[in-house]
Amino acid sequence: MDLVSFFNPYLENVRTKKKTKSTFLRIFPRGIMHDGAPGLMKTLCDSEPRMFYQDKQYILKNDMTWPSLSQVAEKELRAPLKFHIYDASESLLFTDSIENIPFQYRHFVIPSGNVIKLFGKTECGKKVCINVFGQNSYFYCEYQCKKELNSRICSLLNSSEIKMSCSFSIESVTKYNFYGYNTEPIKNLFKLSFSNFYISNRIGKILLNEGVSVYEAEVEILNRFFIDNNLKSFGWYQINYLSIQEFAKSSNVEIELNCHVSDLFLLKEDSWPLYDCCSFDIECLSQNGNFPDAEQMVTSSLISVIDFDSEGNYQSKHLFTLGTCEQIEGVFIYEFASEFELLYAFFLFLKCKSPEILTGYNIINFDLKYLCTRMEKIYNFEIGGFSKLKRGKFSVIVPYEQHKKFLNSLTKVNMSGILCFDMYNVYSSKISAQNYKLDTIAKLCLNQEKENLSYKEIPKKFIDGSKGRAVVGRYCIQDSLLVVQLFTKINYHYEMAEVASLAYITIRCAVFEGQQKKIFPCILHEAKNLNMILPSMNTNFNKGKENVGYKGATVLEPKIGYYATPTVVFDFQSLYPSIMMAHNLCYSTLVVDENAVIGLHADDILTVHVGPVTHRFVKKTVRESILASLLKKWLDKRKEVKMQMKMCNNPVMEMLLDKKQLALKTTCNSVYGVTGATHSLLPCVAIAASVTCLGREMLCKTVDYVDSAMYSDTFFIEKFGLTRGDFSGTFGIEVIYGDTDSLFVTFKNVCPKALKRIAPSIASHITNTLFKHPIKLEFEKILFPLILICKKRYIGKLDDATLVFKGVELVRKTSCDFVKVVVKDIIDLLFWDVDVQKSAEKLSNMTIQEIYENGVPDGIQKIIKKLCDARDALFLNRVNIKSLVLSSVLSKDISAYKQANLPHLAVVKRLAQRKEELPNIGDRVMYILIAPTETVKKTFHNYELAEDPAYAIENNLKINADKYFEQIMKAVTNAISPIFPKTGIKKEKFLLSILPLKVYVDQSFCDLTDVL
């Protein structure tokens, strides 16, 4: 190994201390030398790091060939070369590097210049890195004099603020402001082009802070590259001239080429090459048995790697282990004497295998972060060179705010030329589960039971000799194999590739960045085609309006109750995008300068009143909205893709098309949110406020039309062809709830079958009568009967006998199974038992006095009996403790919680005290409420009673029946309170008052009575 000094914070006091010989710190479990011995050992080693594989010893070196990986035969490259790119990164080159660059590209990097690196595969499967020269960074600004501007830029380049030099040019240009309707170009506008993206961004910000009107200063060089050249971040390319970088390569891949931007040709093909993927998992040992902390005295004991391709085809299985390990069938096993050697070999393997995709389960928040921290902080070893670039990046990035609050959901990964897809993050965002542990998700999504090895057993097995390490190794490999199956099941990589291609961004950006980073480049591209430019943050016309609040779209408070008549639910299709399209809302149509609309007729302008503020937009006859044209293009494309899906017979192509239409849908729905975010790249509260205001007006119009025009049965007979036989009494119609993009309309005395037949026609009639294209009201479902509890909470029965639950305890993850079963049983009575239905309707119309005199209707006694049975089961200890498990998400580190007295936090603290396996951030923490051991206190808080379920079962702890019955009463009240009489009594108190009283005595009291 080249002379490298390893810094050990435990043994060294001065980081700059020199060693005359290469050394590295050896940390390893004592058990790999003496079977069963606990603890870790550490020592300095001055021999070369090595690996043992199939009874042979290999010296670990950066340029080594990995023994178990087959070498691909080299093929002669010929122009034209066809290749597929999947990733890109920006870099800078300086004058001191020009001797390694072909002559024709040198002037682009004197004194410094941008180089775009494209990563991909050739048509024959060779890995390739393309160095693209000639892409400038630029922005625009308003300045009185070109000469003065030139002088200012030169001054900045020579100042201490920049500390770098580059070539630049200034030219006068004619462009229009994207923000605000206008007919005149921006005056005194100049385009400033720089060969160095860092300097361009820096100078743009400086001018912006000085009060200069600046445009597009925040546009990233990769966005410029894709948009300016109309290229895609993911797809097939062709290059007709080959300039091969044979010496002084900057990459670790087989082929490195140089080209100019103009040499790239985008091909129209949707297929994928087979990309190499690796799924990995690590197991760690800590000295004290606590959860591993990468900066403390711990060691990585095992790393499993599954090598597969992007279609899920397995290639090989690999296991990196400390100490000897008994052979595992079909697995390449590499043995090491210390953790550093194991980690070094793992990174060497990644470099040799050079996968395009790295995946695992919770690898961003633990595995990758742990590996990077160990190598950088414990071993003082730079790992960026193990990516696709020799001077690349291989890091886990924790934003400052996150580091401060320990909010791991924002953690990002940057590996040059390697995409990272963490299946934990993917599945926790895509599906609903009680918890997101790998075994839970495997059971739910793959219908597979994971062979479990408890957290406490792993260290014992590992130090128990080569057989024990093989057990842990199989467990580790099993996890990696499950991840491969999860990876190929959800095909998230295809979805992100479509998002990236659509938005002119890299896949890495699509995975780790928010929606504004995806929408902004799309707007930029569309504006560029219309010769418009986007103002930078401080120059927009939103100033002074950021704090203007605007209401959400809820327009009609729910008329809470139990509805034993059919309720039709109508839904607006893509409401917010369709409003923007119908009313021509856009940055470019917003009136911000009254002089610009002088001469326009009043009919050419849409006026929207949002509280005390008025917003005005020019109509399509004057200027078409760029946002509307973007949305139309995306929605039309989505329709086209869905049609292709119907005609597609190839399952793989159908899946790719599905991911494409999903990407289009997500992007459309994100546009509104980007305009309303005041801290986005291009905020515009005027658009967001106008959209919600127009949405409210639409809902109000619909309610008024239903009340004024659709109130009689004659209307439905004449318009929709119903007959008198379809009515069973006096007709009635009422809008009982309107929220965001839905309407709930109840119909009295109409045949449900006839109503379902005409419901789509009703939606079409309202659409054609009230709304502008493309706004469309659609029939969604009929609920009969319906319990409308409050906003966004209801229970209803579909015509196929399926119950629909929205926002009730039955579907909440925090509730325990026993509570859910009781609530479900009672709800079933209300929806399936005719006697209970009639009694519920009667009860809802009774007064409290009538109940005192006559009691509740007979059918309600069935509900009361269910509650009494549940109470008996709890107090008489008949409930399985597993069905009483509650849960809450550990959303951040315990120290970041302002309220420390929460039940799940108390359980985590108890687990830590007992040195049990701790949950990861983002996991659901399971707990039960146990009976108090002390009897002095009258009341106990839940956090005082919360305990780990496994510990409670193991120690035969009693449950707290009172607490669980309280939960049942609250849950049942929340679910069925609309059937209660309208009284001033609290709902829960009313339900409790109709239950018969019962006293439960302790067994010790029974024993005492026997004695007496």
Curated annotation (Swiss-Prot):
Ranges that cross the membrane: none
SMART domains: POLBc (SM00486)
Keywords, ordered alphabetically: DNA replication, DNA-binding, DNA-directed DNA polymerase, Host nucleus, Nucleotidyltransferase, Transferase, Viral DNA replication
One GO MF term: DNA binding
Protein EC: 2.7.7.7
SUPFAM superfamilies for the chain: DNA/RNA polymerases, Ribonuclease H-like
Top-tier EC class: transferase
Annotated Gene Ontology cellular component terms: host cell nucleus
Pfam family, one: DNA_pol_B
Subcellular localization(s) per the UniProt record: Host nucleus
GO biological process, one term: DNA-templated DNA replication
Catalytic activity: DNA(n) + a 2'-deoxyribonucleoside 5'-triphosphate = DNA(n+1) + diphosphate
InterPro entries in the cross-refs: DNA-dir_DNA_pol_B, DNA-dir_DNA_pol_B_CS, DNA-dir_DNA_pol_B_exonuc, DNA-dir_DNA_pol_B_multi_dom, DNA/RNA_pol_sf, DNA_pol_B_thumb, DNA_pol_palm_dom_sf, DNA_pol_type-B
Similarity annotation: Belongs to the DNA polymerase type-B family.
Protein name listed in UniProt: DNA polymerase catalytic subunit
Native organism: Human herpesvirus 7 (strain JI)
Gene behind the chain: U38
